[in-house]
From Swiss-Prot:
Subunit structure: Heterohexadecamer of 8 large chains and 8 small chains.
Pfam family name, one: RuBisCO_large
GO MF, one example: magnesium ion binding
Cofactor note text: Binds 1 Mg(2+) ion per subunit.
Name of protein: Ribulose bisphosphate carboxylase large chain
Entry-linked InterPro entries: RuBisCO (IPR033966), RuBisCo_large_chain_AS (IPR020878), RuBisCO_lsu_C (IPR000685), RuBisCO_lsu_C_sf (IPR036376), RuBisCO_lsu_fd_N (IPR017443), RuBisCO_lsu_N_sf (IPR036422), RuBisCO_lsuI (IPR020888)
Record EC number: 4.1.1.39
Further comment found in the protein's record: The basic functional RuBisCO is composed of a large chain homodimer in a 'head-to-tail' conformation. In form I RuBisCO this homodimer is arranged in a barrel-like tetramer with the small subunits forming a tetrameric 'cap' on each end of the 'barrel'.
UniProt: Mg(2+) binding residues: K194, D196, E197
PANTHER family for the chain: RIBULOSE BISPHOSPHATE CARBOXYLASE, RIBULOSE BISPHOSPHATE CARBOXYLASE LARGE CHAIN
Positions carrying N6-carboxylysine: K194
Amino acid sequence: MSSKSYSAGVKDYRDTYWEPDYQVKDSDFLACFKVVPQAGVPREEAAAAVAAESSTGTWTTVWTDLLTDLDYYKGRAYKIEDVPGDDEAFYAFIAYPIDLFEESSVVNVFTSLVGNVFGFKAVRSLRLEDVRIPLAYVMTCNGPPHGIQVERDKMDKYGRGLLGCTIKPKLGLSAKNYGRAVYECLRGGLDFTKDDENVNSQPFMRWRDRFLFVQEATEKAQQETGERKGHYLNVTAPSPEEMYERAEFAKEIGAPIIMHDFLTGGFCANTGLARWCRKNGMLLHIHRAMHAVMDRNPRHGIHFRVLAKALRLSGGDHLHTGTVVGKLEGDRAATEGWIDLLRERFIPEDRARGIFFDQDWGAMPGVFAVASGGIHVWHMPALVSIFGDDAVFQFGGGTLGHPWGNAAGAAANRVALEACVKARNEGRNLEREGKEILQAAAQHSPELKIAMETWKEIKFEFETVDKLDTTHR
């Protein structure tokens, strides 16, 4: 029988979960939340409430607290900061002991950090801005099935970014016509083509038919060009059993890479598929469909940098990241920050890029950043400058929309990429001299010349909704 006294009733969260003098441990999970409390709720109380509800707390004192070491297991709100430009919101920094989380389980981490607390009445809005995953926990996770260097070795592609294309129209093509589009793109010079996120197994194109026609197209393009090619076969399915059936069939027919929608498919399915890919030598492309539901509102949800970290833990060799210059939302500094979080081994805190904590990935492989969404040849200099070589540049409409057809669109993109890489390696400034570099290359490539004429007026100049806090620039 414990000698501790037990006092029933309700007490302020800050009495237990607010510890401004707490010394953060290397083994702690750290989280930064942007909090907008309800009127009349003090900042310390709101921060402590978030710490409690995302760890050991509930709305009242319970006698079973005496049966464990609550002081060891609880989350602690240890720091509060103002949010520049927002008088209502503040940043709450919370530390969680590593033993609160099951090893190698992104599912359990997110169930704890964001599973219940986002509906808490004490806060008007809540956003998870960043997390620090301790190295001790990173080492329990398998991470990407292969990573950047292994993929380059498998595909025999070095010294430049990879080129891809999403087949369009994304829905409605027959399997035979879909395969034809794949073949034209790959023979024209692309490294990969891909299924779009919502291509699964619809009445107009069942998955098995698509896989067979696409693999035939891929192998034919390989034989003609002498280059290794691939198509991201989307194995996302109604159930895990069907997902693995599709993955096994892709392996049987010789496909080098498959694809998964990791947010709609779920972290459990994604982690299992990543482990299967590692065991079976398959590359894994990850689409982020549904991400903007969670990450676009600057006051509520989960920032994409957190989702990117979660994917690296769960496993994937590619991840869509936005483009900065294309049709999708993306602040440049923030995008460069999460590109590094996907690829580098150690990323220091850098508020100018929205990174709130140091992140050490140890020996975990990196992930190719995928730039996709409304891009064309005129964007190539900026893309190479922003993303570097360890990226996949995917031109859907920017390939299939070429007036001369898919193969010509692919050739235009290949010439533009190689011209930009060559110019960069010679020391030229791509963002300042990009127009001249492309115009010079177009003198020897009629496909590129026509592409430049076709899309010379196409821009996506809209104000970014989710901006970095301006005083951290």
